[in-house]
Swiss-Prot record:
Assembly, per entry: Homodimer.
Class of enzymatic activity (EC top level): oxidoreductase
Ligand binding (NAD(+)): D146, T175, D232, G257
Record keyword Oxidoreductase present: yes
Organism field: Blochmanniella pennsylvanica (strain BPEN)
Record protein name field: Erythronate-4-phosphate dehydrogenase
Pathway this chain belongs to: Cofactor biosynthesis; pyridoxine 5'-phosphate biosynthesis; pyridoxine 5'-phosphate from D-erythrose 4-phosphate: step 2/5
UniProt record similarity statement: Belongs to the D-isomer specific 2-hydroxyacid dehydrogenase family. PdxB subfamily.
Length: 374
């Protein structure tokens, strides 16, 4: 079979190259001509998969190595019997650790304690639920908002979005991008929400850029409103508002989910679906794709926020990604070039922590570190 894949997806040849003809290319440049004679298409969020791309093609199977699917016309795929698979939840650990890293950095810079703050989580799917779990495991109070889930399961202590805007010190968004229907998320944070938001709040967006009206956000910041802003996603990507970037406390190029481990989990999910769909025996030794522990530390004092921040920075320094974006954002194609050449970070599980303190063992294990009691 003939496979076309985004060149920035790892392990493509190792997984699919044994009995197939595999071609890789830039995801944003994939055209109808490229897929005309292709059987299998594997993409990321930068490729729009729709009628314009797939009409007159021989594509039978589409996989996207992403949790979001707003770049995929699923109705079209269903209409023409094209099998589709995506990778929900596989980037959850990476995104949660990105958010936690950003919050720890802000807390250290602002000299406040996260345990004194209330975190409002908007969207409590794979990512939001894991973030809630980890924050609570570290003693941080959370408020949850997810109207579609509340409709299905009313037993949780759900809060309205208006309550989060009024009461949460920190708002972090983990929703899909939905334009219509009962629960649209497009411009969920508009000028009215931003003006109602108390000063000195923290806004974090790692889901889709258009969940926050970027022009409205820039307007209130230019008018002097004091907000801390962490943006990994932007409206009109790969272009972004340079003035808005100048106001952001942390700005990164849509890489919150870009860990080595998350990329491997995502493509493995697509590979397994491919094997099932085409009735192919899975001969891959999955252990060959495992990412080994690469850092070792011994901790001899009880974990607090300052020490946790040091451990996190040992694995991933979020300031580095912020500096890189600011350096190249104004250059032609800079946003995509950073993503293309991004040195995928490791997750906290890559850090082997040795400690003789029982409470450290419990806390660090729940936060996702690789812990060994000594």
């Amino acid at each position: 079979m003939r496979i076309l894949a985004d060149k920035n997806i790892p392990h493509i040849f190792k997984l699919f190259g044994l009995h197939n003809t595999v071609t890789i290319c830039e995801g944003r440049g994939i055209s109808a001509k490229d897929v005309r004679d292709i059987d299998i298409l594997i993409v990321r969020s930068v490729t729009k998969v729709n009628k314009l791309l797939l009409d007159d093609s021989s594509v039978k199977f589409v996989g996207t190595a992403t949790a979001g699917v707003d770049h995929i016309d699923q109705n079209y795929l269903k209409k023409y019997g094209i099998n589709f698979v995506y990778a929900p939840g596989n980037n959850a650990v990476a995104v949660v650790e990105y958010v936690f890293s950003a919050l720890l950095w802000l807390a250290q810079r602002g000299r406040f304690f996260l345990r004194d703050k209330i975190v409002g989580i908007v969207g409590v799917g794979h990512i939001g639920s894991l973030l809630n779990e980890r924050l609570r495991n570290f003693g941080i109070h959370t408020l949850l908002c997810d109207p579609p889930l509340e409709k299905i399961n009313s037993s949780k202590p759900w809060k309205s979005f208006e309550t989060l805007v009024a009461e949460a010190d920190i708002l972090t968004f983990h929703t899909p991008l939905i334009y219509y229907g009962d629960y649209p998320t497009w411009h969920m944070v508009d000028i009215d929400v931003l003006e109602a938001l108390p000063s000195n709040r923290i806004l974090i967006n790692t889901c889709r850029g258009s969940v926050i009206d970027n022009n409205a956000l820039l307007k209130v910041l230019e008018n002097g409103k004091k907000l801390n802003v962490i943006l990994d996603v932007w409206e009109t990507e790969p272009e972004l508002s340079l003035p808005l970037l100048s106001y952001a406390d942390i700005g990164t190029p849509h890489i919150a989910g870009y860990s080595t481990e998350s990329k491997t989990r995502s493509i493995l999910q697509i590979y397994n679906a491919y094997c099932n769909f085409f009735n192919i025996f899975n001969v891959i030794n999955l252990s060959a794709l495992d990412s080994p522990v690469i850092y070792y530390l011994r901790v001899q004092k009880e974990i607090d926020e300052t020490l946790l921040h040091k451990l996190v920075k040992f694995v991933y320094n979020i300031q580095y990604d912020d500096v890189i974006l600011r350096r190249f954002a104004a250059k032609s194609g800079g946003f995509d070039k950073i993503r293309k050449h991004y040195l995928a970070r490791r997750e906290w599980s890559s850090l082997r922590v040795e400690t003789y303190i029982d409470s450290n063992n419990e806390i660090l294990t729940k936060l996702g570190f690789n812990v060994c009691c000594v």
